[in-house]
Amino acid sequence: AHSFRRFIQKNLLKAFESSPKENPLEGVEKNLEVDDDRLAEIQKDTNFDSTPLEWMWRVAQGGSIGRNALAPLDIDHEVRAVRTKVGGSREARIRLDSFLRTKLGRYDVGRNDTDDGAASGLSPWIHFGHISPYEILYSILEREGWTPGDLDEESTGRGSRAGWWGLSPGAEAFVDQLITWRELGYNFAFHREDHYSIDSIPEWASNTLSDHTDDRRQSYTFEEIEAAETEDEVWNAAQRQLKEEGLIHNYLRMLWGKRILEWAPSPSDAADWMIKLNDRWALDGRDPNSYTGIFWVCLLYTSPSPRDG
């Protein structure tokens, strides 16, 4: 992360010059109509008893009507909709505004607080494209009254986690997460086709995990873990939160992963189990950042000790 942060500090202003347009489709002819024959074909193939438009309205209505509308689809019907979270860009901006007003100022000291945390909770909306990291960043910079002149030119390229932007401590900490760690995950996924495999971790990390495979004091099956049926009640609570709310508190996510690493038969099994659970239940799963977070548990982006190296 340090070397990637150094790169960002040297090149970020250039990236600002080519940032996305607010409306990338402006001036582009948009024809969203679908041919009637194609609609009839879709209706026949899916065996729906309604037109596509009627079907969308039924799904949006939710409840038993929505579930019945979704029933013909080949999806995992055991994973229920998360009723406490509403999708869409409007909801994303409401949550962003709330975060900026009530949490950003204490993000640097409160993001790991499980009782009254300062985490943004925006990852599902970012994952589904309901809000852009650019919009979040620009909202913070505007709120802070930031200009390029606030950058600490003397520390540019040193990779400092705080102070380079010239923002408040909370904003500095959040922007580092939003840019450095998020983009690090996407950069890794772009360059490594095996980014979702334990084969992507360094050799020293793989050797270290293998050396400690026999250290496990307790073991559970995948089914027991998915059902949150362990003797660790804190871990069970995190797993239930994942299944019911589609998220795990940031601070508990690392505990969640490390315990699976401890309980699984092997590091490879642990990685597979974490990916399977996260991809199935997490609203921000199936994402480069999910995989880098999981493999951080497996020592990715950490440095070897003299004994390990």
Per-region residue spans from a language model:
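Trp/Phe/Arg-rich N-terminal binding region typifying the photolyase-homology
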Residues: 1-30, 240, 259-289, 293
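Glycine/tryptophan-enriched, flexible segments
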Residues: 2-199
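Secondary-structure transition/capping motifs at alpha-helix termini
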Residues: 143-148, 164-167, 245-249, 263-268, ...
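Short, mixed-charge aromatic SLiMs
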Residues: 162, 180, 203-210, 276-289
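Aromatic-anchored, charged helix-turn/loop surface patch used as a conserved interaction hotspot
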Residues: 176-238
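C-terminal structural cap/anchor segments
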Residues: 224-259, 264-267
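Polar low-complexity intrinsically disordered regions
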Residues: 295-299
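Conserved small/polar residues in nucleotide/adenosyl-binding loops
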Residues: 301-308
